[in-house]
Curated annotation (Swiss-Prot):
GO BP term, example: asparaginyl-tRNA aminoacylation
GO molecular function, one term: transferase activity
Name this protein carries in UniProt: Asparagine--tRNA ligase
Main EC class the enzyme belongs to: ligase
Main location: cytoplasm
Subunit structure: Homodimer.
Organism of derivation: Bacillus anthracis
Family that this chain belongs to: Belongs to the class-II aminoacyl-tRNA synthetase family.
Length: 463
């Protein structure tokens, strides 16, 4: 007999009612009495489990009744519709085969476990409701983002993980080397001789695929990357991880307004898709994790995003009379409290803040005519603050070179990036979405460690 997915049973209960089916899965819960028992069986295809009813007609009734949690079984039985019960159907078992026994010391017993504890058993936590929901939504959201760009003719570019340049100019990068760390070759000046390393120069794990994506945007027009990025930032916060995923589109012949429109469209598309394709998971988050999740998402989907310049935002914050922990003055990088005040109290919806001071933004952002600000934008959303950052890129060779020199960066490291301006450069723009931050926003999960399957944070590289 062919295996039937639990998802299929839930999606088309009427079709299967009265039929004999075979399902395979893991025991999430088991209750028994002398004459009969109930198994909550989850096969991984659906958020909800299926209830298996078994009784003494089974030859191995006593053996089944004593099975430890997480044991895997194969069940044959009849689908019985139960419209008045908690679940729409159950399966009356006619045969249960044991596929794999679980030891009695299985750590996920019938009690609530803290997220902190579950991080210590990250290899088992997807078996819990919270993480089953989280990582299915992660998969669905990733697909939605790919589909959004593919439907619009974007080319998906795989950018390198190992790089010789620092996109952000922040210097917080993981070094890549094959040098013998007990005998590192050094030059006459006593410094490490990078020419003796594998790549013949200093290399690092990428902090962004943006620069490489720009190269392809100037050939394919509309491109995007979706891949892992790495920051050697020693921050033990709920919002930082050493390894995370970024969505980074680049569009040629485009200005800042174009990329803001793209940002708004993508965000609404992805949220709608998740709500449509993960209704059970989203209901779980709204009931047990954050009771504002659905309201927040619908607010984003149904709002026209606001727009305000950084200079105007500073004035609004200064005149608000709010008691901020961090003082507000022109030139500062907005703190989370400022961002949330703008999106929650002033606009009550997502808002783009544009035209930031050049001194607090990256070297590649286009210098505005005032010489003080750049064509950059941050999207601020209620409940979290900054969600997405984007900019129009500097297409003028002389201005870009001056900016690189001004920041004390090595011009030679960016020779190929500068050549993009030399050979038919044009206005272009893009944004970066931290995928995990997006997941935190739509699930209500409060810690980035809980939306990454195996998080990498300072002092933690288990699994």
């Amino acid at each position: 007999m062919e295996n039937t997915l639990v998802k299929s049973l839930y999606r088309d209960t009427d079709k299967y009612a009265g039929q004999t089916v075979q399902v395979s899965g893991w025991i999430r819960n088991l209750r028994d009495s002398k004459a009969f028992g109930f198994i909550e069986l989850n096969d991984g295809s659906f958020f909800k489990s299926v209830q298996i009813v078994f009784d003494t007609e089974l030859d191995n009734f006593k053996e089944i009744a004593k099975l430890p949690l997480s044991s895997s079984v194969k069940v044959e039985g009849k689908v019985i519709a139960t419209p008045g019960a908690k679940q729409p159907f159950e399966i009356k078992a006619e045969k249960i085969d044991i596929e794999g026994l679980s030891d009695s010391d299985y750590p996920l017993q019938k009690k609530r476990h803290t997220f902190e504890y579950l991080r210590t058993i990250a290899h088992l936590r997807p078996r819990t409701n919270a993480f089953s929901a989280t990582f299915r939504v992660r998969s669905i959201a990733a697909f939605a983002i790919h589909q959004f760009f593919q439907e619009r003719g974007f080319v998906h570019v795989h950018t390198p993980i190992i790089t010789g340049s620092d996109t952000e100019g922040a210097g917080e990068m993981f070094r890549v080397t094959t040098q013998d760390l007990n005998n590192v070759p050094k030059g006459e000046d006593g410094q490490v001789d990078e020419s003796k390393d594998f790549f013949g120069k200093e290399t690092n794990l990428t902090v962004s695929g943006q620069l490489n994506a720009e190269a392809y945007a100037l050939a394919f027009r509309d491109v995007y990357t979706f891949g892992p990025t790495f920051r050697a930032e020693n921050s033990n916060t709920t919002r930082h991880a050493a390894e995370f995923w970024m969505v980074e589109p680049e569009i040629a012949f485009a200005e800042l307004g174009d990329v803001m429109n793209l940002t708004e469209d993508m965000l609404k598309y992805a949220m709608k898709y998740v709500l449509e394709h993960a209704p059970e998971e989203m209901e779980f988050f709204n009931s047990f994790v954050d009771k504002t999740v659905l309201e927040r998402m619908n607010n984003v989907i149904n709002s026209d995003f606001g727009r305000i310049t950084y200079t105007e935002a500073i004035k609004v914050l200064q005149e608000s009379g709010a008691d901020f922990k961090y003082p507000v003055e022109w030139g500062i990088d907005l703190q989370t409290e400022h961002e949330r005040y703008l999106s929650e109290e002033i606009f009550k919806r997502p808002v783009f803040v544009t035209d930031y001071p050049k001194d607090i933004k990256a070297f590649y952002m286009r210098l505005n005519d005032d010489g003080k600000t750049v064509a950059a934008t941050d999207l601020l959303v209620p409940g979290i603050g900054e969600l997405i950052g984007g900019s129009q890129r500097e297409e003028r060779m002389d201005v870009l070179v001056d900016r690189i020199k001004e920041l004390g960066m090595n011009e030679e490291d960016y020779w190929w990036y500068l050549e993009l301006r030399k050979y038919g450069g044009t206005k272009h723009a893009g944004f970066g979405l931290g995928f995990e931050r997006f997941l935190m926003y739509i699930t209500g999960m409060a810690n980035i460690r809980d939306v990454i399957p195996f998080p990498r944070t300072p002092g933690s590289s288990e699994f």
